[in-house]
A protein has these predicted regions:
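Helix-to-beta-strand junctions that scaffold the AdoMet/dcAdoMet cofactor pocket
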Residues: 70-72
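Rossmann-fold dehydrogenase core element
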Residues: 76-78, 90-132
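Short acidic/polar active-site loop segments enriched in Thr and Asp
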Residues: 21, 75, 156
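Adenosine-nucleotide cofactor-binding segment
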Residues: 1-65
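Residues in the short beta-alpha loop(s) of Rossmann-like NAD(P)-binding domains
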Residues: 8, 83, 108
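Short glycine-/small-residue-rich Rossmann-like dinucleotide-binding loops
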Residues: 58, 81-82
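C-terminal hydrophobic helical "lid"/dimerization subdomain
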Residues: 48, 64-68, 113-163
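Short, hinge-like loop/turn segments at secondary-structure boundaries
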Residues: 19-24, 44-45, 95-97, 120-123, ...
Length: 163
């Protein structure tokens, strides 16, 4: 199971195109008393919690939710998104001493000199979807429109052509 989570319902089709088997919009999860509704929902639908979570948002509240939705004993939460400068993340120590792991990732953990050439070769052979993530292109003169596409959730990635 791969569960994609986004507040923009338009992202569901893209998520499923890239391999998600389920989609959860946090806005559709009813509030609960005395806890985080998303954590409780995810733990309930996965029979105890997720094996792996990946936060790409940079939102410190989502980072904590991703950790706390992990399964006790073996769940691993990886932070990929970058938080605003000066922000700090926190959780109760109980979340970690019960076996969950919280880690960060830069560049997917790839070692540039030794591993990147092989990844590029696999991309060139068609093993990885990369081009499909670019849903919009704008010339430099329309950079503001490109940013609007991103902020309004109309695209996955917008490339700004400098030429």
């Amino acid at each position: 199971r791969i569960i994609a989570i986004d507040t923009n319902p338009a992202k569901e089709a893209w998520a499923k195109e890239f391999g998600a088997t389920e989609f959860v919009n946090p806005k559709d999860v009813p509030p609960v008393e005395g806890g985080d509704a998303m954590v409780q929902h995810l733990v309930a639908i996965t029979d105890g919690g997720l094996d792996y979570t990946f936060d790409c948002t940079g939102n410190i509240h989502v980072m904590r939710t991703a950790l706390e939705a992990c399964h006790k004993g073996w769940g691993v939460s990886t932070i990929i998104g970058v938080a605003k400068s000066g922000e700090e993340i926190s959780t109760r120590p109980f979340q970690l001493v019960t076996g969950r792991k919280w880690q960060g990732s830069a560049f997917g953990g790839v070692k540039g000199r030794t591993q990147l050439p092989g990844i590029v070769n696999r991309y060139l052979q068609g093993d990885f979807k990369v081009d499909e993530y670019v849903t919009h292109r704008e010339p430099l003169s329309r950079i503001n429109e490109g940013l609007e596409h991103m902020h309004e959730g109309q695209c996955i990635r917008c490339v700004i052509d400098l030429a």
